[in-house]
Design a protein with these regions (language model features):
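Divalent metal-coordination and catalytic microenvironments
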Residues: 28, 48, 70, 81, ...
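Active-site neighborhood of phospho(di)ester-bond hydrolases with catalytic His/Asp-centered motifs
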Residues: 74-80, 108-111, 139, 175-177, ...
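Histidine/acidic residue-rich metal-binding segments in metalloenzymes
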Residues: 156-176, 182-248, 254-275, 284-300, ...
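Short, ordered loop/turn segments at secondary-structure junctions
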Residues: 110-113, 141-143, 179, 209-210, ...
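Active-site microenvironment of metallo-dependent hydrolases
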Residues: 1-46, 51, 99-101, 286-302, ...
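Divalent-metal coordination cores built from histidine and acidic residues
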Residues: 2-14, 92-203, 508-512
Length: 603
């Protein structure tokens, strides 16, 4: 008899009173996700399984009895869509944080790792997390790269790669299908990817940003069944009506009041409503929390606590096809969290597989890294750079005038045009403009760096560099001063990746991320401190204007699958037409001026 079968046999016996429970939780108020009730009950556990939920005080026979002292007992919380890489922590360090907050299961799309390492990146995600008490369900990334032909990452995934990954038992579905254009226009690659998911019988996650009407219907018809890219209350309502599972995310909190208001107008809060974090940086994960922070925001905006908990438990379990999770019921896995209040959720105790693993925000036993798994390093395949590499030039023009296309806007980008002066072969940056610069870092091509004018970020005072840039994770630098841009970039090349700020010839802040150029091997608290310091000091380089021109937007400046212009390692791209666009509209040579500024991009 298998160990699982033996546990179930023992659970049946214990439920009938023929043998004692391993653990009996008494004096609990059960938050019943099936009925919406809060009711007094005790919970008997055998091994990793709930054996019985029965009237309070009706059973006392157990090897161990624990009183929850009237606390509210909920199923463990579940995150239906997350990129662990956004925490910049390896899986065991990430798990140590979220487990203490009551999150016991996550659906991880490791497409950041996959865009650097290919299938090996997904294998690392599986191998590095399979031993953890956190239930980690890995998805097979569909966006490697997110927009083929417009960017080059460290690998290319199509049907064959998806079939390989979907054949692994730890892989539970197809990760967010970001190439909406390819799906809607019958791309052979995207048809292969989605069909591999359909053939596997596993989940197919969506990324339906901006889709509505006929295009949204077509996207669903292709086989996609969820979306976390909600942009408004109307968008959330339309996607629910269309039949998508919506994943309300915590990474865009400014949208939550309107989305909550829309949900409150509905006659029924469907099982199609779940929650996810998507991306949470390390300092916010530690200080505010992951899913728990989102749930508290939804409660603060007026949704009933039991409904909010249902989003993160039963609804999530239904979405993720996990019939062993999501309810406090006999036969389900004993992943449980205890709250002392339903007004503001704070995990007092967390049980995983029937074992107490965290109390009052502290893990009882630290988690070790997976034995025999070597984190991938040395992934920035770049030689040191010079300031000359960061000068914008117009070929063949030493002195003259040019009209250039440029990127306008921080989060929602639009095309712009501007006339610039050229002196001594260098474009003179117009007032209010900065530069964005991208270089391929995966060793798959040796193209020269790409550089473009950037409006809407103000005049950056120095440089910001990152090797964590959605979704191809090439080396990206923003700035106006070529010397500072080179300094920040070289800091990352030397450290194996991460983020850096430079100003007036000095490094203001640097967070090293030597694992795949996106994960740190620092203790979580130290990483959070360094990341917070870098974010705080970034205001010396940039003038932030929430909600769009914010520090987090740095990571998305090259996301070519989104509408509008973006710069990638292949050039200036258009998300709508799926074309690489020449930034040069027109230029002409003019006589050299007698006097001019000789340091336009290094000031």
């Amino acid at each position: 008899m298998s160990s699982n079968a033996e546990v179930r046999r023992r659970a049946v016996q214990a439920a009938r009173g023929e043998s004692p429970f391993d653990l009996l939780l008494v004096d609990a108020q059960i938050v019943d996700m099936a009925t919406g009730e809060i009711r007094d009950a005790d919970v008997g556990i055998v091994g990793e399984m709930i054996a019985s939920v029965h009237p309070r005080g009706s059973r006392t026979d157990a090897h161990e009895v624990r009183s929850l002292q009237g606390g509210y007992l909920s199923p463990g919380l579940m995150d239906t869509h997350v990129h662990l890489e956004s925490s910049h922590l390896p899986p065991e360090r990430y798990a140590e944080i979220v487990l203490t907050q009551g999150t016991t299961a996550v659906f991880w799309d490791p497409h950041e790792l996959a865009n650097v390492l290919g299938v090996d990146g997904v294998r690392y995600a599986v191998d590095a997390s399979r031993h953890l008490p956190l239930q980690v369900m890995v998805a097979a990334p569909s966006s490697v790269p997110s927009t083929p032909g417009l960017e080059m990452s460290g690998a290319d995934f199509a049907g064959a790669e998806m079939e390989t990954m979907l054949g692994w038992p730890e892989v539970r579905g197809v990760a967010e299908v970001m190439d909406m254009h390819g799906v809607l226009n019958g791309s052979e690659r995207m048809q292969e990817i989605v069909q591999a998911g359909l053939n596997s019988g596993k989940l197919i996650e969506g990324h339906a940003r901006g889709l509505s009407g006929a295009d949204l219907q077509a996207y669903l018809a292709a086989g996609v069944t969820s979306d976390h890219e909600l942009t408004s209350a109307a968008d959330a309502r339309e996607k629910l009506r269309a039949g998508l599972t919506i994943e309300i995310r915590g990474s865009h909190p400014y949208l939550l009041p309107d989305i909550v208001a829309a949900l409150k107008t509905l006659p029924h809060l469907s099982s199609q409503i779940t929650v996810c974090t998507d991306d949470v940086p390390p300092d916010m994960l530690l200080e505010k929390g992951g899913i728990i922070a989102l749930l508290n925001l939804l409660i603060a905006h007026g949704l009933p606590t039991v409904d909010v908990l249902r989003f993160a438990t039963l609804n999530a379990a239904i979405r993720l096809q996990r019939n062993d999770l999501g309810l406090i019921a006999a036969g389900r896995r004993a992943d449980l969290v205890v709250f002392d209040s339903l007004e503001k959720l704070e995990a007092q105790e967390v049980y995983v597989g029937g074992k107490l693993i965290a109390r009052n925000g502290h893990l009882l036993t630290p988690l070790a890294a997976a034995p025999g798994v070597t984190p991938p390093r040395d992934t920035l395949q770049l030689a040191p750079l010079d300031a000359e590499d960061f000068i914008l030039r117009i070929k063949g023009i030493r002195h003259g005038v040019a009209r250039l296309r440029h990127i306008s806007g921080a989060r929602f980008t639009k095309w712009g045009e501007v006339e610039v002066q050229i002196r001594d072969g260098e474009v003179q940056l117009p007032a209010g403009f900065s530069l964005i610069w991208v270089k391929h870092r995966h060793g798959r091509h040796q193209a020269t760096p790409q550089i473009a004018l950037l409006e809407g970020w103000g005049e950056l005072r120095g440089a910001i560099a990152t090797s964590y840039s959605h979704d191809s994770h090439n080396l990206v630098v923003l700035g106006r001063a070529a010397n500072d841009m080179a300094l920040a970039a070289n800091q990352l090349i030397a450290s194996g990746g991460g983020m850096a700020l430079a100003q007036q010839g000095e490094i203001l802040a640097h967070v090293a991320m030597p694992i795949a150029g996106m994960l740190s091997d620092l203790p979580a608290a130290e990483l959070a401190r360094q990341f917070r310091e870098l974010r705080d000091l970034s205001s010396k380089v940039a003038d932030w204007e929430p909600p769009y021109r914010v520090f987090k937007a740095i990571e998305g400046t090259c996301l070519a699958c989104n509408a509008g212009p973006h710069l990638t390692d292949l050039g200036l791209t258009d998300g709508g037409s799926r074309q690489i666009v020449d930034p040069l509209i027109a230029c002409r040579e003019t006589p050299a001026p007698t006097h001019h500024n000789n340091n336009p991009q290094g000031a």
